């Protein structure tokens, strides 16, 4: 398939050919969901903690004598049913990360790219370069292209001026090709690829 290439000013800059093996798949929501869940689980902190009955600071002495009170038989005041007692099966510090096969992760990226193509949400820009690091000028260029919520993927090296100018614009993310991922593609409205990014993707999945 072919897509028109544009400049940041909105002018035509030729066409680019896209591989059907990367951009032409029928998107599978189950694959996308698995990859996104894996990504978010990897990011989750896991610093949650609640003290159990062995950890709370409280006497371990028997609350009252076993017999003769008419009350229920209790031992430690650290038991979870009492106020100030330990939490039963509470959260512990742990990693939420889980394994996902490399082939599934790669397939997820191809399905995410295909989903954006199918929704007509992919724009190819010849070069992500800004003459100066001015947010106002870049925001105006994005407005011309109709980009209010977008992920920009550049080549292996991002232009410093472009990156600085874009980082203060709301709902705009800029990543080098090494950082392309399913979650960021799906969470943004438009996917903007530089020609260098398209070439790198073709090389990666060849």
Curated annotation (Swiss-Prot):
GO terms for molecular function: rRNA binding; structural constituent of ribosome. GO terms for cellular component: ribonucleoprotein complex; ribosome. GO terms for biological process: translation. It comes from the Bacteria. InterPro entries: Ribosomal_uL4 (IPR002136), Ribosomal_uL4-like (IPR013005), Ribosomal_uL4_dom_sf (IPR023574). Residues 63-97 are annotated as: Disordered. NCBIfam families: rplD_bact. Part of the 50S ribosomal subunit. This is Large ribosomal subunit protein uL4. It comes from Rhizobium etli (strain ATCC 51251 / DSM 11541 / JCM 21823 / NBRC 15573 / CFN 42).
